[in-house]
């Protein structure tokens, strides 16, 4: 069974459209250059992916080789909409779970946000979760470049975003049932996309001598 897991994983990872990850990286660089904001969000395991990605993106590209040495490099601005349990549960209780991310965006978007270079990256198993779709729709109204890393065909989100990254295939590995039959590999690819973007941004910062 262990061999099955890795066989599936390698097959799926080789089927990804690497050009879309490259495109997402290029958008990320433009956000950094123009001092925009990266918004992240997810559901379930995707929430953990969004959390970890936000932490990595805020720190690793700007960390000295000796981690105890602080740097003055200008960092990228990242807001993880999945981060505050108080905010999420408050909105879910008062308004509804479908609004937990779109309501938070009202704190950040203004009329002049359209002129800014911002990026939203969502991590979703199916791409159909209403809270994800609602946030993407609002972000697009304010000119935000949007991406969703998801599986099972990409769902509604993949039809809305500028850069849909869809994890293909199914899994026969146990522990995944029903519509989550490829959930393990979807989440692993989501984590990998975050690591790739973080590493490439680190390379950019080093190359520019920032």
Predicted segments — roles?
Residues 36-41, 115-127:
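A short, small-residue-rich loop immediately preceding and capping a beta-strand
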């Amino acid at each position: 069974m262990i061999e099955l897991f890795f066989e599936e994983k390698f097959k799926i990872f080789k089927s990804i459209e690497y050009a879309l990850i490259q495109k997402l990286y290029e958008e990320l660089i433009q956000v950094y250059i123009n001092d925009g904001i990266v918004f992240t969000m997810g559901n379930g395991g995707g929430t953990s992916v969004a959390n970890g990605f936000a932490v990595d993106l805020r720190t690793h590209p700007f960390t000295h080789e000796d981690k105890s040495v602080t740097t003055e490099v200008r960092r990228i601005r990242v807001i993880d909409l999945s981060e505050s349990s108080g905010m999420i549960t408050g909105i879910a209780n008062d308004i509804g779970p479908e609004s937990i991310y779109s309501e938070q965006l009202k704190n950040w978007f203004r009329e002049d946000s359209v002129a800014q270079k911002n990026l939203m990256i969502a991590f979703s198993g199916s791409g159909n979760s209403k809270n994800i779709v609602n946030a993407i729709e609002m972000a697009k109204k304010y000119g935000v470049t949007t991406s969703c890393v998801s599986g099972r065909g990409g769902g509604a989100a993949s039809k809305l975003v500028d850069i849909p990254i869809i994890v293909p295939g199914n899994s026969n590995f146990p522990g995944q049932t029903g519509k989550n039959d490829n959930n393990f590999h979807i989440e692993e690819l989501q984590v990998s996309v975050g690591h790739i973007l973080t590493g490439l941004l680190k390379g950019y910062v080093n190359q520019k001598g920032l």
